[in-house]
Structure formats: structure tokens, C-alpha cells
UniProtKB/Swiss-Prot annotation:
Keywords: ATP-binding, Cell shape, Cell wall biogenesis/degradation, Cytoplasm, Ligase, Magnesium, Manganese, Metal-binding, Nucleotide-binding, Peptidoglycan synthesis
Molecular function GO labels: ATP binding; D-alanine-D-alanine ligase activity; metal ion binding
NCBIfam families: D_ala_D_alaTIGR (TIGR01205), PRK01372.1 (NF002378)
Top EC class, one word: ligase
Enzyme Commission (EC) number: 6.3.2.4
This protein's record includes keyword Metal-binding: yes
GO cellular component terms attached to this protein's record: cytoplasm
Pathway involvement of the protein, from the record: Cell wall biogenesis; peptidoglycan biosynthesis
Manner of cofactor binding, per the entry note: Binds 2 magnesium or manganese ions per subunit.
Gene, per the UniProt record: ddl
Binding site for ATP: 127-182
Cofactor(s) needed by this chain: Mg(2+); Mn(2+)
Name of the featured protein: D-alanine--D-alanine ligase
InterPro entries: ATP-grasp, ATP_grasp_subdomain_1, D-Ala_lig_Van_CS, D_ala_D_ala, Dala_Dala_lig_C, Dala_Dala_lig_N, PreATP-grasp_dom_sf
């Protein structure tokens, strides 16, 4: 009898629609691999739903709070349902950008300088010397990210408005010029490195990530061999330092601009990367010789408790 997999998707975070895309793509691929699949749009009754379903494993395709911060992982541990991706601690740690940076820095991974500030204070005066980036402490998909370019710019006033829905504290970081890189990690190996070139603008914002034609993916990234290998080393070290399991994706910046610093820094580790067939991790896996079906099969067969 084929293994029964519950694909968890949707939820109630700001990344709901992205999660539905990931979940439906994974579900279709698993069906193609011969699994019995139940698509679960996660709501407040998720404990009851899973108790009644009793799947053999859960593929976690949720994004954002509750889905990648240790919450759903803790529930799955309580219900004794093996699951994919990282466990409770690694998920919670990676989701909190500042605490994740502290752990990565201790492991020798270069990260941008920065500090946590109250959003109202950041709206009154520059928390760092521009250029700098302000971002929510615990959001994905570049939600709420603001770049302040020079001293003449006013501090971002949206931080003090009712439109800001990403928490009272924000992370201000030194802006690192240069190239946007990402590296997929699968288990104990780094699969490959992609350079992301936004079609409009100079950084990989929400529209560049999810709008059709919003970015160009250069795979493998056109880097000197030593830099390419260093990106992979940093991604794998960050994955291991945070205690990640299964699939993760590290996002980095590399300043190779004329007269630049040459800095290569890890911005964050995403424990629940996008999982449509055209998402970054499946693209990198395909380039490494692993089809989308093979990738999701590996993820389900890797599922366990106590992650």
C-alpha cells in the first residue's frame, strides 16, 4: 500500500498564496511518484484534521509565521506524525533573523552588521548610517523590506504607521552592494548556487520573486571557482549551525562592485523555501540532476520526528 502523505499548505500568514502554490505543486509531484496524497489547507482546526487523517508523513509546504517558526512542527511532534524540513528549534531560530545571525556569526559565517530597534524609533531617526536595510524580524518573501540609500532620505515613515503589520521591533542592517546569490542545501550537501538578477530594481523584492519575468536566474552563478565554493561552504555551515534538516536555502550578497569591499555575507537561511517547479531550490536540484518528483520523494522519505 502506498504511503499516505498530508501536504500542509495555505494557512493564514501573509505568504498564504505562495504556500498554496508550493503545496499544490508538491502534491501533484507526489501523486506522480505514486503516493496517496491529501491536500490540507491549514486552519485553526488543524490538530483535529490531522488526528482524523493519521497520515504516514506530512510534507510541510507552509510559509511564514505558524508554518516555519516551530509552531506546526511542535504540533506534528505531539501528534507523532513524521514531517519534512527542519524541526522545532531550527525553525524558530532561523525565522528570527537577529538570533539566527548570532548563531551563524558564532559558527564563523559572515553576516551583515546591524541591530534591532523599535519601529517608531527607526521612523524618527536613522538607526544606522545609510545605506541600510530595514526588515521585519520574522517574515519571509521580502515582506516589509525597505532600503534607505543616503543621509538625505527621510527615515521610512511607514514604520510608524498603522500600515506596518510586521511587529514592533525591526532589524536594521548595513546594506551590502553587489550580487544576489542563493544556495540550496539538501541534507548534508550544498547542491549549487544561483545568481538572481531582478529585471527592474536592484534587489530581489516580492514582485521580483513571484511576478512572471520579475527576475533572471543564472544557474550556475558566474563566479570564480573559489567564490562559488565559498558560497556553498557558507550555506552548508549556516544550515548545520542552525540545526536545519532536509531542504534549506541560504540567501547571500556578494560585493564585487568596482572599489567594493569584496564582502560575501549570508542574509538569512530559509527553512521553508518555495517549492513550485520553477522555484529556486527545485531549479538548482534539477541542474544537479534531480527531477522535481525525485526531490519531493527524497523529502518525504527523509521525514521523521525529533528533527
Amino acid at each position: 500500500m502506498s504511503k499516505h502523505v498530508a501536504v500542509l499548505m495555505g494557512g493564514w500568514s501573509s505568504e498564504r498564496e505562495i504556500s498554496l502554490r508550493s503545496g499544490n505543486a508538491c502534491a501533484a509531484a507526489l501523486e506522480g511518484e505514486g503516493y496517496r496524497v491529501t491536500r490540507v489547507d491549514v486552519g485553526p482546526d488543524i490538530a483535529t484534521v490531522l488526528t482524523e487523517l493519521r497520515p504516514d508523513a506530512a510534507l510541510n509546504a507552509l510559509h511564514g509565521p505558524a508554518g516555519e517558526d516551530g509552531t506546526i512542527q511542535g504540533l506534528l511532534e505531539i501528534l507523532k506524525i513524521p514531517y519534512t524540513h527542519s524541526g522545532v528549534l531550527a525553525s524558530a531560530l532561523a525565522m528570527h533573523k537577529e538570533r539566527a545571525k548570532t548563531v551563524m556569526r558564532a559558527a564563523g559565517v559572515s553576516v551583515p552588521e546591524g541591530r534591532v530597534v523599535n519601529r517608531h524609533d527607526a521612523a524618527k531617526s536613522h538607526p544606522l548610517t545609510p545605506p541600510y536595510v530595514v526588515k521585519p524580524i520574522a517574515e519571509g518573501s521580502s515582506m516589509g523590506v525597505i532600503i534607505v540609500r543616503d543621509e538625505r532620505s527621510h527615515p521610512p515613515q511607514i514604520l510608524a504607521s498603522d500600515e506596518w503589520v510586521y511587529g514592533e521591533e525591526v532589524l536594521a542592517e548595513t546594506y551590502v552592494a553587489g550580487r544576489e546569490l542563493t544556495c540550496a542545501v539538501l541534507g548534508d550537501r550544498a547542491l549549487g548556487v544561483t545568481e538572481i538578477k531582478p529585471v527592474s530594481g536592484e534587489w530581489y523584492d516580492f514582485d521580483a520573486k513571484y511576478a512572471g519575468g520579475g527576475s533572471i536566474h543564472v544557474l550556475p552563478a558566474d563566479l570564480k571557482l573559489n567564490i562559488y565554493q565559498r558560497v556553498q561552504e557558507l550555506a552548508l555551515t549556516a544550515h548545520q549551525a542552525l540545526g536545519c534538516r532536509g531542504v534549506s536555502r541560504a540567501d547571500l550578497r556578494y560585493d564585487d562592485t568596482p572599489g567594493g569591499t569584496g564582502a560575501l555575507v549570508v542574509l538569512e537561511v530559509n527553512t521553508q523555501p518555495g517549492m513550485t517547479q520553477t522555484s529556486l531550490v527545485p531549479e538548482i536540484a534539477a541542474h544537479a540532476g534531480q527531477s522535481f518528483g525525485e526531490l519531493v520523494r527524497w523529502m518525504v522519505e527523509d521525514a521523521s520526528l525529533n528533527r
